[in-house]
């Protein structure tokens, strides 16, 4: 997705670094674009039945229904307003992304550009695993929204 996200200092100056070079990378980039729909029912179509999703600071969700419920729950408290993938690569069935998501806390209206490392596993064109690594405390403090229990 092309957006107004300022390129982080860590990002490659080579725009091809964020372009897909394999079918799995293409699917992941399509999914990244779809995230801004903030629609769990639309997003779950990218997932296999036997899947998992985890924002690494938080508990995992196993199975398609649990992943959809987790996403739907997240979208009640935040929206994903933009996603910019600066680096993407893959090896041995894993796709890695370095990206910035613009997240807005719905209760406070505050937005924050969150740097995220995402790891995706795909089988037959469907996501079987998705793990995002980021600093949860940094996000919570920036938008005044505690997500941890």
Swiss-Prot record:
Top EC class for this record: hydrolase
Keywords from the named record: Hydrolase
List of catalytic residues: 101, 132
Variant or mutagenesis effect after changing residue 55 to A: Almost no activity
InterPro entries the record matches: LEH, NTF2-like_dom_sf
Protein purpose: Catalyzes the conversion of limonene-1,2-epoxide to limonene-1,2-diol. Can use both the (-) and (+) isomers of limonene-1,2-epoxide as substrates and also has some activity with 1-methylcyclohexene oxide, cyclohexene oxide and indene oxide as substrates.
Family label: Belongs to the limonene-1,2-epoxide hydrolase family.
Protein name stated in the entry: Limonene-1,2-epoxide hydrolase
Lineage, highest ranks first: Bacteria, Bacillati, Actinomycetota, Actinomycetes, Mycobacteriales
Encoding gene per record: limA
């Amino acid at each position: 997705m092309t957006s107004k996200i300022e390129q982080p200092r860590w990002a490659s100056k080579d725009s091809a670094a964020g372009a897909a070079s394999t079918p799995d990378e293409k699917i992941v980039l399509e999914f990244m674009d779809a995230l801004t729909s903030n629609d769990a029912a639309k997003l779950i179509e990218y997932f296999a039945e036997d899947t998992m999703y985890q924002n690494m600071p938080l508990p995992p969700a196993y199975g398609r229904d649990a992943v959809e419920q987790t996403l739907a729950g997240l979208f009640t408290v935040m929206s994903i307003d933009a996603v910019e993938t600066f680096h993407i690569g893959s090896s041995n069935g894993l796709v890695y992304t370095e990206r910035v998501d613009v997240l807005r806390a719905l209760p406070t209206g505050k937005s924050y550009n969150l740097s995220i490392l995402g790891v995706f596993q795909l089988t037959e064109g469907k996501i079987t695993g998705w793990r995002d690594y980021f600093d949860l405390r940094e996000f919570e403090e920036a938008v005044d929204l505690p997500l941890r229990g």
